[in-house]
Amino acid sequence: MNLLKHMNWAGDSKIYPEVMDELGIPDASGWDKGAFEREVGRLNPAQRANWDAVYGPMNEEFKKAFPNMTEKEKMQWRYQRYMQDYLGTIEAVDENVGRVLDYLEQNNLMENTIIVYTSDQGFYLGEHGWFDKRFVYDESFKTPLLVAWPGKVEAGSRVDEMVQNLDFAQTFLEAAGIPAPSDMQGE
C-alpha cells in the first residue's frame, strides 16, 4: 500500500473525521469515515479520554499546519504519524515482554519455560514507498522469531532455516512429551 495514495487520514493517521471535513480532505483510500467512530466507539469512557488526550492536541496542530503543507510534507507527516504509532506499539510490547520475563526470573521459572517471540509476518515501514504488509517482497517475508529454550537453544545463536508457525504446536507438544495427533500438520 502506497504511502502517498493509500494511507488514509482517519484510520492510519488518527485525524478525526470532523477535522477532515473542516479541512476539506477527501479520503482517497475510500475508507468509510463512519468506521472511525465505530472503532473509537468501542472504547470505554476512560479509554476514549486517553485517546483524545493523545490525539486531540495532534489534531489541533495538524489543523493549523495542513493549509500550508506541500503534498510532500503531507506524505511525510502521514508517514511520521504512522511510524510514531507503530514505534509506540513496539515500545509497549517491549515493556510488557520485559514484565513477563521479570516475573519468570523473580519466580525461578526461566529454566522451565520456553519463550517464543514472533509475529504473523514482516511489515513495510516505508520501503518501496509502502506501508503495511500486503505485497510479496522480502520485507513482508521476514517474520521475527526469537526463542529462549533452556538446554535446547544456545543464547545468541542464529538459524537461517525457514520456519512456519505451523510447526509451533508440534514443537510444544514434543517438548511436553505429548504425542501429536496423526492428522496434525507441522513438524
Question: Model features per residue range: what roles?
Answer:
Residues 165, 169:
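Zinc-coordinating Cys/His ligand positions in small cysteine/histidine-rich zinc-finger domains
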Residues 187:
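FAD-dinucleotide binding site
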Residues 1-162, 175-183:
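Active-site-proximal cap/lid insertion segments
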